[in-house]
Amino acid sequence: MHVLDVVSRAPETGLDMKRCRVLVVNDYASMGGAEVVYQQSADLLSRLPGVEVERFDDTRFPVGTTKWSRSWNIAAARALEETIVGFRPHRVMVHNYHNALSNSILSVIARQKRKLGFRAYHTSHDYHLVYYNPALQYFDKRRPVILPLEMLGTRAALTHRSTTKGLVHDLMTKCYWHAVREAFPPTEIFETIVCPSAFMEEALHRSGITNTRVVFNPSSVPVALQPSSAAGRQRFKIAFVGRISQEKGLAEFIELAESVNFHRIDVIGVYGDGPDRRAMERRFTSLIERGKVVFFGRLPQEELFPQMRRFADAVVVPSLGAENAPLVIIEAAMLGLPALVHDGGSMASTGDAVGNKIKFRSQPESLKLALDRLAMHLADKGRRYSLAEYLPEHYQQRLAEIMELGEQAGTAPSRRTDEAVC
C-alpha cells in the first residue's frame, strides 16, 4: 500500500495527516438514482484502507428558490469552499451539481485546485455537459423527443427547442450554457469524467470531451437472487419503480397497455412518488378501481426490494428521456426479474450483457411482441443473468483505480507540499 509521507495530526485543523481525504459532492442527499449512487460511492470509498471520506450535499447549503439562485447558487459555492478549505481534500468526486449546487461551484473547484493541488473527478449522471437539456431532450410541439447523438454540436441541436418555456427562455438557456462551457471547460476542471454507460461516453466524445472512463453504477441489491419462474402462466405482474413524472413515461406505458387490452399483463404496480401522481390517479381512476393499476407509494430500499420480489414478475422502464444508466434494470436482474425497457437513448444499450432486457417501442404491436417474449423468457427455468460488473466491490475497485486511492495509489508527483499526499 502507498505510504503517506507525514504521520502526524495537524494540530491547527485536527485532520489525520496519515489518511487520504476524499470529498464526495452531490446536489441532494436523497432523491433519485444519482443520490443512491452518491451515497454508495461515499460508503464504498470510505471502506478503502487509509481513506477518509466527507460528504457535501443539500444538508449543508440552502437550495435556491429563485431563477437566479438556481442558476448560480452563491450560498452553495461559499459553503463548498468553506468545506474544501477546512477538510483539505486530496480528491474531490462530484456527482450531480447542475440542479441545486449550480455551476457556481465550478469556479470554487478550479480556484481551490490551484491552491491545494487536489484532483477532481465527475460522475456524469445527466447530459448537462453535452446539451442544453440535461435529459437530452428537445420538444416538438411540446412533445419530448430524445436528441440523437449524431445531432450533438450541429446546427439542428442549436435550433431545436430544449425547453417548453418559450423562445426567450430557450435562447437564454442556450447562451448561459455556452458561457459556462467557455468559462469552465470540463476537461480542465475534472481529471476524469466517469461515465455510467457507454452511451454517455459517446455523447461526451461527440462533444469534444474525451477524458472519460466507463464505470457501471453499482447495484443497491447486494446479492443476486435466483431468477424467478413463471412457467405455465399467461399473465404477469409488472412493476414500475421510480419518480412519477412526465419524462419517466409511466402514463404513456399505461395507455399503451390499455390499447392492447392489457395483453399478458395482470396488473401494473407503481412504486414511487412524484409531481404527476395525483393527476395520474385521477386520469386512470377506472383502471385503479378494476385493479389493473396499483399505486404503492414510495418505500425505503430495505422494504422496496423484498416487496418487488414478492409482487412482480418483471419491471418496466418506459422512460421518454435518454436516461443514462437506469439502475432499476440491474436491480431487477439482481432480484431475478426481467425488465421491459423502452428502446431509446441509453436504455437501448444499458445492461445488454446482463441478459434480462426485453425491449419495446411505443407502438401496440411492439408491446404485444415484447410481452410474448417476456412469457417465453419467464418460462425458461435455466436462465442466468451476468452481473459481475455491477457489484459494489467492482465499482469500488474501479473508482480506486481511477482516483488512485488505497492500494491503487500512484507515484505521480504532486504540487502539495504542506502535508501527506495520497
Question: What residue spans do the PLM features occupy?
Answer:
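Acidic anion/phosphate-binding donor-loop and adjacent secondary structure
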Residues: 7-9, 205-206, 210-236, 408
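A conserved mid-protein helix/loop that constitutes part of the nucleotide-sugar donor-binding site
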Residues: 35-40, 236, 240-259, 275-278
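Membrane-proximal helix-turn-helix segments that form the acceptor-binding/catalytic region
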Residues: 128, 139-192, 202
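Nucleotide-activated donor-binding/catalytic signature segment of Leloir-type glycosyltransferases, i.e.
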Residues: 281-299
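Acidic donor-binding loop of glycosyltransferase active sites
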Residues: 309-324
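Short hydrophobic beta-strand element within catalytic cores of glycosyltransferases
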Residues: 314, 338-341
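Conserved acidic donor-binding segment of nucleotide-sugar-dependent glycosyltransferases
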Residues: 354-365, 372-377
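A charged, aromatic-enriched C-terminal amphipathic alpha-helix characteristic of glycosyltransferases
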Residues: 376-413
